[in-house]
């Protein structure tokens, strides 16, 4: 499946430690709700602002909360037609789409769907962790959603990076340092193999109720992890 060459960079309202990289011309930057304030602090103007604005006051846009009602849940952007019918306005001259706060998709996932609809395949989630543990876990699930769609997703913490892989392998250069963990996001991950790390693992099964894959280490050699069947979270030091 082909897609756009650039990255879809989504900045949320969670803990923000600055941008891990500067957006390139071909990248598409989306502010998820009050993530717009994080981008302003970094001096970056997004291509799009998306949110229900229950955490940020915007002139002409009223953010509210309300009781949850039953809504259809769609597995892909093409079927999630609501993203084509969002209320449109502008915030400081930037295109803005307003989401009904009574919804199943959190703002970050809505941004991902829009990026998918735009043709992007690489998603970088910044400001997606913090004091709301439920939001942090939800963003890990967004990584799993992306992996199931055949996309690449990355969630940035202050010192660590998280990504999800599904039925594939990932190689790391010998320059990598620090800790490396592999945790099952699926009920089970079968055929997990880790080579070139401090602890060698061959064709094991990991499950999501036992943190067996915690705290391996890079050792200055090329390393590889693979999973034959399942969605695996990879967490590793990136600074």
Indicate where each model-derived feature is located.
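N-terminal beta-strand-loop-alpha-helix module at the start
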Residues: 1-82
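Non-catalytic positions within long, well-ordered alpha-helices that form the structural scaffold/packing
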Residues: 40, 116-119
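Short phosphate-binding loop-to-helix
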Residues: 70, 74-92, 96-117
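Short glycine-rich or small-residue beta-strand-to-loop segments that form or flank ligand, phosphate
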Residues: 97-98, 123-128
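Short Gly/Thr/Asp-enriched flexible loops that form oxyanion-binding sites at enzyme active sites
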Residues: 133-144
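Short, acidic/small-residue loops that bind anionic groups at enzyme active sites
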Residues: 145-162
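Long, charged alpha-helical interface segments
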Residues: 160, 165-239
